[in-house]
């Protein structure tokens, strides 16, 4: 049978139609410079992406080191700027060492794959970030996915394994609903069964812990020898990039074995300079972390969410994707930019508005949010 004349991409139209019918098509929305909408959608938790010191940190780095890092960190892309920032962030979080990657996604890929591999066991929470899911798939380890925040299931997987090496991976703060992982209990299980714990602090750094040092710091696990922390520089620190923090032996191993580090161009100087400046602002102004949680509580109250949020994230479940998307659109039309999470990001039937609090929200911003959310959610919940 011949297939001549068939378009190899014809199937894309069919898939697009299916997504459209299910209310799951995605589209890029251009954000204008200096827009007037109140931002409850970005991950700029501390409001540092436009902070004068952070912007100047990026500009200063470009002037000194150029627009790009010019190569892999193993060739020409490793600068004094990269290493200085790594040392500063490690000291801030209580880690022995740090290694910067080009994104939080590649940091998770690099850490999980390089620290597991064939003949090992990976135990992953069912709601970990997509980068951790993909890392597990690429690892060639045996993977056990446990129910969300189920410590008993983690212990069962570790206790019944045949593999010598085991790694448990989890977010510290889960991105869709902002709830916290029971890190102390998970670590106790890992210690009993000789497993390494990898924790993604993307949504914990800058918000939880002493002065925003993260949930690991808050539960007394900062610098633990059997814990590896990953995080992004694109949320609380308002820049871009990712980092793996932990024992020096882990850093040395990743330099040798983490493919997203070895074969990727080093993070651009501007991003490193901005992240370092943001870290310095956080050190100087630790109250920003508290302000995030206070503003999240105000948003939760506006949405009739009963519990005080544990993080910057306030999740308002509306059910079907069309309802959530219409609500997000209505908010934007009234000057409020909110996130909209639909499957496959969240389970079917749980499409939601995802609001993110920022330390820099003003009283006027919160008043606008209360007014718009009251109007939009009343209509959406009818």
UniProtKB/Swiss-Prot annotation:
Q: Could you tell me which residues carry N6-(pyridoxal phosphate)lysine?
A: 235
> Where does this protein hold substrate?
26, 129, 345
Q: Where are the transmembrane segments?
A: none
The pathway is: Cofactor biosynthesis; biotin biosynthesis
Enzyme kind, highest EC tier? transferase
Q: Which reaction does it catalyse?
A: 6-carboxyhexanoyl-[ACP] + L-alanine + H(+) = (8S)-8-amino-7-oxononanoate + holo-[ACP] + CO2
Going by the UniProt record, its keywords in alphabetical order are:
Acyltransferase, Biotin biosynthesis, Pyridoxal phosphate, Transferase
User: Could you tell me which InterPro entries the record lists for this protein?
Assistant: Aminotrans_II_pyridoxalP_BS, Aminotransferase_I/II_large, AON_synthase_class-II, PyrdxlP-dep_Trfase, PyrdxlP-dep_Trfase_major, PyrdxlP-dep_Trfase_small
CC cofactor: pyridoxal 5'-phosphate
The alphabetized list of GO BP terms reads: biotin biosynthetic process
EC number(s) reported in the record: 2.3.1.47
The entry lists its GO molecular-function terms as:
8-amino-7-oxononanoate synthase activity; pyridoxal phosphate binding
> Which Gene3D superfamilies does its entry note?
Aspartate Aminotransferase, domain 1, Type I PLP-dependent aspartate aminotransferase-like (Major domain)
Q: Which residues bind pyridoxal 5'-phosphate?
A: 104-105, 175, 200-203, 232-235
Functionally, this protein is described as follows: Catalyzes the decarboxylative condensation of pimeloyl-[acyl-carrier protein] and L-alanine to produce 8-amino-7-oxononanoate (AON), [acyl-carrier protein], and carbon dioxide.
Q: How does it assemble?
A: Homodimer.
Give the family from UniProt: Belongs to the class-II pyridoxal-phosphate-dependent aminotransferase family. BioF subfamily.
What is the protein named? 8-amino-7-oxononanoate synthase
